[in-house]
Amino acid sequence: MSTILFYTRALIIGATKSQGVFGKTGTLVANISSNRGIISIVPRTNPPQKLLKMQEEENSLLEEARKVVPALSFGKHKGQAGRVGVIGGSEEYTGAPYFAAISAMKAGADLAHVFCSKSASTVIKSYSPELIVHPLLDVPNAVTLLDEWLPRIHSHVIGPGLGRVDATLNTVKEILIKLKKQEIPIVIDADGLFLITRDPSIIHGYTKAILTPNVVEFQRLSKSMNLNWESKDLNGSIMETVALSKALGGVTIVRKGEVDIVAAGDEVVTMDEIGSPRRCGGQGDLLSGVMALFSYWTHNSTCTPPPTLLAGYAACFLTKRCANQAFQKHGRSTATTDLISEINSVFVNNFENPTDPKS
């Protein structure tokens, strides 16, 4: 069994005091390199038994996330802060790709492209003139036409509103293969996860990919890999998430729930920010859009944690803060559009680096 790394600013699985050296705040500091918030837990035969509630520290993951956010500058040109693509959108589902794309823009992406079916394009265009919409997914030569656009985009979300039409799924499979060859970061959600469940080999070993399953999607993915998914406690859920990530060759898993679990191979962090008890549709689309943007930023930086792990953590944090703020204002009437309205406030208060030059 290999060593598993756990990160601060979250619930951390720790050994008992007899198995590690603890600092004055109760933080396990054994095997820490330069005390940068990376905790190495010595593996045990039994699952970890003790959860330690960590305090936010100077070198937390949130601090690491701030470092990758590009400073606003008069000297930059359009596109440098991020060009995000959303591959999804069908006749039945037009809101999901819109939520993902507009959320990426509200978090700081300069441009957002939506690649959807022809029947969805006019509707999505009507939601916002800020999105660039390509009605290409269901045309006969879709992959050839998309070849012009895919390399121009820094990161992609695959799945929001995609639908399960076989012809479209086959097109998306070809797109995925091309994105892997081009080494472009991708986030896969919703019907994109359905595609991966049918054929996990599509994504196996691609460590620039993040999968974002909810509880049901996690069960299906685990079944497809012949893994356990029935744990009822956080310890077991963490180990299951790590196991799925490793079974997929190190692909990052963001297991959504009351406590979000982000696992990148043997490295994992949990995020227990309080979100909203209002479970309106579209919150996962906001999450995936913001995560794709963070994934571009983290891969374009020299951050200490794995880029996909940091991107997953930052996006989960931002989404839950947005949900909480929106619920405080709107209560039972909270909708995803209310969460999107909170993105700027949450971003400014938690991710803007006050020392960055704004010139």
UniProtKB/Swiss-Prot annotation:
<dbReference type="GO" id="GO:0110051">
    <property type="term" value="P:metabolite repair"/>
</dbReference>
<dbReference type="InterPro" id="IPR029056">
    <property type="entry name" value="Ribokinase-like"/>
</dbReference>
<keyword id="KW-0520">NAD</keyword>
<dbReference type="Pfam" id="PF01256">
    <property type="entry name" value="Carb_kinase"/>
</dbReference>
<feature type="binding site">
    <location>
        <begin position="256"/>
        <end position="260"/>
    </location>
    <ligand>
        <name>ATP</name>
    </ligand>
</feature>
<dbReference type="GO" id="GO:0005524">
    <property type="term" value="F:ATP binding"/>
</dbReference>
<keyword id="KW-0521">NADP</keyword>
<feature type="domain" description="YjeF C-terminal">
    <location>
        <begin position="61"/>
        <end position="350"/>
    </location>
</feature>
<feature type="binding site">
    <location>
        <begin position="275"/>
        <end position="284"/>
    </location>
    <ligand>
        <name>ATP</name>
    </ligand>
</feature>
<keyword id="KW-0597">Phosphoprotein</keyword>
<keyword id="KW-0067">ATP-binding</keyword>
<dbReference type="GO" id="GO:0047453">
    <property type="term" value="F:ATP-dependent NAD(P)H-hydrate dehydratase activity"/>
</dbReference>
<feature type="binding site">
    <location>
        <position position="161"/>
    </location>
    <ligand>
        <name>(6S)-NADPHX</name>
    </ligand>
</feature>
<comment type="similarity">
    <text>Belongs to the NnrD/CARKD family.</text>
</comment>
<keyword id="KW-0547">Nucleotide-binding</keyword>
<protein>
    <recommendedName>
        <fullName>ATP-dependent (S)-NAD(P)H-hydrate dehydratase</fullName>
        <ecNumber>4.2.1.93</ecNumber>
    </recommendedName>
</protein>
<dbReference type="InterPro" id="IPR000631">
    <property type="entry name" value="CARKD"/>
</dbReference>
<comment type="function">
    <text>Catalyzes the dehydration of the S-form of NAD(P)HX at the expense of ATP, which is converted to ADP. Together with NAD(P)HX epimerase, which catalyzes the epimerization of the S- and R-forms, the enzyme allows the repair of both epimers of NAD(P)HX, a damaged form of NAD(P)H that is a result of enzymatic or heat-dependent hydration.</text>
</comment>
<feature type="binding site">
    <location>
        <begin position="214"/>
        <end position="220"/>
    </location>
    <ligand>
        <name>(6S)-NADPHX</name>
    </ligand>
</feature>
<feature type="binding site">
    <location>
        <position position="285"/>
    </location>
    <ligand>
        <name>(6S)-NADPHX</name>
    </ligand>
</feature>
<keyword id="KW-0456">Lyase</keyword>
<dbReference type="GO" id="GO:0046496">
    <property type="term" value="P:nicotinamide nucleotide metabolic process"/>
</dbReference>
